[in-house]
């Protein structure tokens, strides 16, 4: 079983029945399934659910570098400096780490698209807060090759045979070792600030794969 849900805000990504508004009670799915990773209670969008533990581990393990894509709306205009800083790695002192470099693209005056290959706790919200931004809406629109598309909020669908075949190809050589909560990327001692990080950028305004090589310092992953 592998299904794609458009999770509404307010639903908690846990199989714990004791948790109020948990996703399992919300779905009332006839068979036992559990979520592939998490999506913040306040966030919405694509959530995969399955009964296959190997798929969960291969998708979620950070070292496998699988992509997850989000559309984010913030409380003030998105600047070039903000985009460059987000793309180049953000030190999150409270988690003792610096985020990996990622791809970011402006999609509106107060909106941007971001593609991550890791899933730190409330990562995008923390990254935005570092630069003095507040997330107003966060929607996950893609996990690897599976897209949210026009699936209505609160509805789910079966992953198609074609999607599942492609997914299996993408995870064929991925580690299936269980994700360990204590596993952390490289630590950072830098304190938060409300200014952009300079360096080798992986994004400009409208071309998500273009690179700016004029930076003067290289950020760590």
Task: Show which residues each predicted segment covers.
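Basic, flexible Lys/Arg- and Gly-enriched helix-loop patches that mediate nucleic-acid binding at interfaces
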Residues: 1-221
